[in-house]
A protein has these predicted regions:
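Acidic, polar-rich low-complexity tracts and alpha-helical solenoid repeat scaffolds
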Residues: 1-198
Length: 198
């Protein structure tokens, strides 16, 4: 999107196009370009993490609007849904402890797969979902270790179980299975003693 140096001005220009002729032949592309401008702004230098998250949010909203408003144009609708998932995925790279963003990305890609099963980007969407699940597993493994180091065996066990379910067959799942086996005797002792689980 080469027009203005300011992506905010660029997105405003594309918004003017969409507002002037919402169902014109150029409006769908302009709506998608609004999202792309916000993505470019999020990738810019000298902005805070909070500002970057707001920019990704604006991009997602623009892409979703394209998918919803132009749902009768399959190319635009599918591209908007895929782009929304990709924007959520980019945002999730900044938000290590915010698993909600990853869930939204996975949901967007899952919707894309369900609604457009014959599109060529379906395999890419599946790969992205798998990569994000592995990333979720890595994050949950860190949380499980945190609880284990503080003697909160039941909480650690919950997160280790999530790890093995999210990314079966990975090194994270193997580690989680090993830790679950190590924690089981401690959990059994707590259960037998009637103590409140830690």
């Amino acid at each position: 999107i080469p027009l203005y140096r300011s992506m905010k001005k660029t997105s405003a220009m594309f918004q003017d196009i969409v507002s002037s002729g919402p169902f014109s032949s150029v409006a769908p592309k302009a709506q998608m370009n609004i999202g792309r401008a916000w993505i470019n702004k999020a990738r810019g230098f000298k902005i805070s993490q909070n500002e970057r998250h707001k920019n990704y949010h604006m991009a997602v909203e623009a892409f979703k609007k394209a998918a919803d408003k132009y749902h009768d144009r399959p190319g635009v609708a599918s591209e908007g849904l895929f782009a929304a998932g990709a924007a959520y995925q980019q945002q999730s790279l900044d938000a290590e402890y915010d698993q909600g963003v990853i869930h939204k990305a996975i949901d967007s890609f899952s919707d894309y797969i369900a609604l457009y099963p014959n599109k060529e980007r379906v395999s890419g969407a599946r790969e992205r979902i798998q990569a994000m699940k592995v990333e979720q597993a890595r994050g949950n493994l860190k949380i499980a270790r945190y609880y284990e180091n503080r003697g909160k065996w039941a909480a650690a066990n919950i997160y280790y179980n999530e790890v093995k379910d999210l990314a079966p067959g990975t090194e994270y799942a193997e580690t989680a299975l090993q830790k679950i086996a190590e924690l089981q005797p401690r959990l059994d002792v707590e259960k037998e003693s009637g103590a409140q689980p830690k």
